[in-house]
Design a protein with these regions (language model features):
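Acidic (Asp/Glu) and glycine-rich low-complexity loops/linkers
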Residues: 2-10, 17-117, 121-135, 146-153, ...
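Conserved acidic catalytic centers in enzymes
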Residues: 50, 138, 215
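Short, surface-exposed interaction patches in beta-rich subdomains
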Residues: 162-241
Length: 241
């Protein structure tokens, strides 16, 4: 459990630094008023800070635009750092901010990693490929309609929630705090799940699973899962019939 806690906090710290700093190149906005467009391409990872609402769609071409009150869009910072698209606030703006009605629309060929720091919401229509990684630090939400990959890694530190449907071969899920992986509609071949705290994990696992639970959380991997369980605390684990 100590190893998992260190890994989770490390991921959260790295994400916070990348979103909150001046690293990467700021992408200038075109347009004015309640709509802005940003000419940026060549990224496959997205990092979001604060309370913004981000809508991500898979498509053949790259596109980034934002809608909302003009004064809030003036504070928005879109940056490009290698493979990363970073959505945050200008350095002169204290804290991450609430977003106050800002919505960012992103289209890209494939999303390989999603990072949320704060209370933002990211909604993704579909993710395909070999691997996918998601990191949530705070109370943010990540909603994925269809996740189809060989492997997926989910790290949640705080009260955030990841919801997903689809089919993957292997899942690694680490939850620390009161967060949740709510993926009863996600079909998984095999899984490695760790929960420390009052968090919850739900998925439909058809093969072997390793579960480590410490605290009052709950893990439900469905009736077909064949689990090796290590449990300490008042939490519950459901595996198999």
């Amino acid at each position: 459990m100590h190893r998992i806690a260190i890994a989770l906090m490390g991921a959260a710290s790295l994400t916070a630094c990348s979103v909150g700093s001046d690293e990467g190149s700021t992408v200038p906005a075109s347009g004015s008023g309640p709509t802005r467009a940003y000419a940026v391409e060549g990224f496959d990872r997205i990092a979001v800070a604060g309370g913004d609402d981000v809508d991500v769609r898979a498509g053949t071409a790259f596109s980034v635009r934002a809608e909302g009150p003009a004064d809030e869009l003036d504070k928005l910072r879109i940056a490009h750092d290698g493979r990363d698209l970073v959505i945050g606030r200008q350095k002169r703006v204290l804290g991450f901010g609430s977003g106050k009605g800002v919505k960012v629309f992103v289209t890209l060929p494939r999303l390989s990693e999603a990072n949320i720091v704060g209370s933002g919401t990211m909604t993704v229509d579909r993710i395909e490929g070999t691997t996918f990684e998601a990191n949530i630090a705070g109370s943010g939400d990540l909603n994925i309609a269809a996740l189809t990959t060989d492997a997926a890694e989910v790290n949640i530190a705080g009260a955030g929630t990841l919801r997903a449907g689809g089919t993957i071969k292997r899942l690694e899920a680490n939850v620390m705090g009161s967060g949740s992986l709510d993926a009863a509609g996600l079909r998984v071949g095999e899984a490695d799940v760790t929960v420390a705290g009052s968090g919850n994990v739900r998925a439909a696992v058809s093969g072997r699973a390793k579960v480590e639970l410490m605290g009052s959380g709950n893990v439900d991997l469905g009736a077909a899962a064949q689990c090796d369980v290590s449990k300490k605390g008042s939490g519950s684990v459901r595996c198999g019939r």
